[in-house]
Amino acid sequence: MRLLSILLFMIASSPAEDWPQYLGPGRDAVWREQKVELDFVKRPPRQVWSVPAGSGYAGPSVADGRVFVMDRLAKPYRAGKLKPGSNVNFVRARIPGKERVRCLRETNGEVLWEHSYEADYSSVYPYAIGPRTTPLVYKGMVYTLGAEGHLHAYSAEDGKVVWQRNILKEYEFETPLWGTAGHPLVEGDLLICPVGGEGSTVVAFDRRSGKEKWKALNAREAGYGTPVIETVNGHRQLLVWDAENLN
């Protein structure tokens, strides 16, 4: 069991900038907050609160006074004896458990809502620890993608499931060796998600309804990269890095 902790930094009276998705507001890992005390020797940060959490690799997102985080709830897994010459880093196993999404109050860690669902893992077992992707918060919605392809859209206010899909099952694609790890992104009314397979390496869904809008590209394996959108020569371009190509 890990602890999720929030540290208090000495910041001016204005509220700190939100961090609503993977790599922050600009998806570039840049924190643009001003007047932040960074001399931790002179003025070290102090812990404000902590709450128990399950296992996982996903970072928290922060938006509108709330913290959104994913984790995994499962009993410890004990592997059987490996065959001679087997590399433990490539041995798959079916491991029962649940994935969970929680919303906490930013000021004190109070759990405002949570949702869990069955998610048996089938990736290589030493890394079958938990979700990889940070929740994405956008215009009152929270989007999460689990390690086995469970894609959910929640109401940020009360945690109601607005829509859900299992992208690996629907697009008939085997769970990547180290789990689904590419983060979805929002562009206008679209939620763009890396998937994998023939014609569905990347899929765009209506972010409000979850309906497929388009799909593109072929890849033998999904890869673990996160799509990026940049304006190049005046045009919005989607960059997708799969297991074989940069598209």
Model-predicted segments: where are they?
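Sec-dependent signal peptide recognition
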Residues: 1-8
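Noncatalytic, solvent-exposed loop/strand surfaces
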Residues: 15-247
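N-terminal signal peptide c-region/cleavage motif recognized by signal peptidases
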Residues: 11-13
